[in-house]
């Protein structure tokens, strides 16, 4: 085998928005409100093999802005930021961390920009998503699997208020 055949391969083939939706159920009246909304942020990751060394990784965010006093949704935006990655010459037990940690870390800044841009274009102040520690989420998931626990929600899903 030549040296190039033994080197790990990691290539970003494509980064794109697979799905994007925005709902403003109480428009246009909601734009007259002065109350600061409560922001709820949910994040999930998934991945699947497409073909051989090609993998699809999806980071999904759902952001809901709600007026607490009136119990009204100002807006709800959901985005599926997706990447196609080529991963080769990597030991089998190391592929999962690449798909669960490295790839979501690459996709998250794009997702953050998509959410912020969509919300701003809808006429609201931008929503800035805080950084996410995908490594901690991955290790938590592995610990739960080792302990045989069934979490209330998948370990690769987080909710923030």
From Swiss-Prot:
It is found in: Cytoplasm. Keywords: Chaperone, Cytoplasm, Protein transport, Translocation, Transport. It holds the Pfam family SecB. It comes from the Bacteria. SUPFAM superfamilies: SecB-like (SSF54611). The keyword Chaperone applies. The keyword Transport applies. Residues 141-161 are annotated as: Disordered. One of its GO terms (molecular function) is unfolded protein binding. GO terms for cellular component: cytoplasm. GO terms for biological process: protein folding; protein tetramerization; protein transport. Belongs to the SecB family. PANTHER family: PROTEIN-EXPORT PROTEIN SECB, PTHR36918. Homotetramer, a dimer of dimers. One homotetramer interacts with 1 SecA dimer. One of the proteins required for the normal export of preproteins out of the cell cytoplasm. It is a molecular chaperone that binds to a subset of precursor proteins, maintaining them in a translocation-competent state. It also specifically binds to its receptor SecA. This is Protein-export protein SecB. It comes from Nitrosomonas europaea (strain ATCC 19718 / CIP 103999 / KCTC 2705 / NBRC 14298). The gene is secB.
């Amino acid at each position: 085998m030549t040296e190039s055949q033994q080197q790990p391969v990691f290539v970003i083939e494509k980064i794109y928005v697979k799905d994007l939706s925005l709902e403003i159920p109480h428009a246009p009246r909601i734009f007259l409100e002065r109350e600061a909304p409560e922001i709820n942020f949910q994040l999930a990751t998934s991945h699947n093999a497409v073909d051989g060394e090609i993998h699809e990784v999806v980071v999904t965010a759902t952001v809901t802005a709600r007026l607490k006093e009136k119990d009204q949704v100002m807006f709800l935006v959901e985005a599926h930021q997706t990447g196609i990655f080529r991963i080769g010459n990597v030991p089998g037990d190391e592929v999962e961390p690449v798909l669960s940690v490295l790839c979501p870390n690459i996709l998250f800044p794009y997702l953050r920009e998509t959410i912020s841009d969509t919300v701003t274009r809808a006429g609201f102040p931008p929503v800035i998503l805080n950084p996410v520690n995908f490594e901690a989420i991955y290790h938590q998931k592995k610990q739960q699997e080792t302990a045989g626990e069934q979490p209330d929600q998948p370990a690769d899903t987080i909710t923030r208020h």
